[in-house]
Amino acid sequence: MKKILILVLMVLFLLPGCSSVQKMSPEQQFKKSFSKNIYETFTETPIKGVYEIYNGQQIYYYLSEGDVLFVGNMISKDGKNLTQESNAKRMTSKLADLSLDNALKIGSGETAIVEFIDPNCHYCRLSFNFFNTRKKDVTLYVLFYPLSEDSANKIRHIFCSKDKAQAYDDVLGGKLDENAQLNLCSDKAAEDLMKAHQQISAKVGIRATPLFYIKGQVVPGFDQPAIEKLLAE
């Protein structure tokens, strides 16, 4: 009788439904292994066992079987950058509700364009030349994302200037390169704008420049054909 009782208890212990140890979900496993990693979303990808993690600024991936994290671009067989597409969708939702009160407004055209730029960025200056001839057609809402100390100083010069639009033209046009004298005031309003742009960039998840938001779509980089197509719609 005692042997039968022991056998029954062993069977009950081995049955999946009776086990006291429940198998963790991939997300629970991730939380346990990478407890310091803060994230907004944890979603499945087209690859079995690989999950997309978005931390508000960057997409990375979790391989549940190996319990490892990795960063990179996921490319489909037809050449689509699935990582870039997913990131653009997330940025789009944030940009759709973005307040532009602190953006530098340039132009007076019907089409509104939000742009994140660094004043020394080569492609940002190419986009400046492109939009500079279209000021009657578009209104730019400029948000700065400095990638160097010199860029930050040039942004401060713009914010410290009485005519910010002209200062923007001078800086992006290259007139203040070659160690030109900059207006680096300690004005609180300028400092507040510097902080506001920094906070907005962090909220949206900006990590490189330029980036544009045109007619509900995100355009990473100065993709002139894509921009021209959107403007023509």
Regions found by a protein language model. Give the residues of each.
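Extracytoplasmic thiol/disulfide redox context detector
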Residues: 5-7, 18-156, 170, 181-209, ...
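Hydrophobic core
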Residues: 9-14
